[in-house]
Amino acid sequence: MGRARPGGVLAVEDADLEGLFCDPDHAGFSFYQRMYAEVLARHGGDPGCARRLVRYFRDTGTPVPQVRLLQAVSTGGDAKAMPLLTLEAIADSIVSAGLATADEVTAAIEDLRAFTARPDTLVSDPRIFQVWARRGADTTPAAR
């Protein structure tokens, strides 16, 4: 918050991967969820960081932040393909990290492709946390 000018706003948005879900439950979707979180963690990310953003704001002495939670859920169309596209994009990272074999990843991709193509399924995107706070007036002697 030190970089925000008095009256300025600090805003942060992050995805919470631990909130992913589908209906009905599906092994290919669960594989995608586990692999996405693991690949992110191995690259220094934190799959559950977003839900702690409010605490991070408070820990820095930031005024009480505002928070908004968004989560898209799809029953059809292009948005429903996001898990499949993500799994395809991280396939090489999964294999190179030794998390699964190329054959296992290929099978999971095909399984997820069939699942997301079904009209009777529901698929979520990660929850998106939006957190923001306004910096109060600067009361340091130099600012007076």
Where are these regions (language model features)?
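Amphipathic alpha-helical interaction segments
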Residues: R52-R55, A107, I128
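Conserved adenosyl
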Residues: P6, A108-E110, R144
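C-terminal helical/coil "lid" or tail adjacent to the Rossmann-like core of SAM-dependent
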Residues: T60, V64-V123
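Conserved catalytic/acceptor-binding region of the Class I
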Residues: V9-D78
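A short glycine-rich, Lys/Arg-flanked "PGG" loop and its adjoining helix->strand segment in the class I
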Residues: M1-V9
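Short beta-strand
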Residues: P47, V123-S124
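A generic alpha-helix surface/boundary motif
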Residues: R34, R51, E88-A89, R127
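Core SAM-dependent methyltransferase catalytic element
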Residues: T60-P63, P83-T86, P126-R144
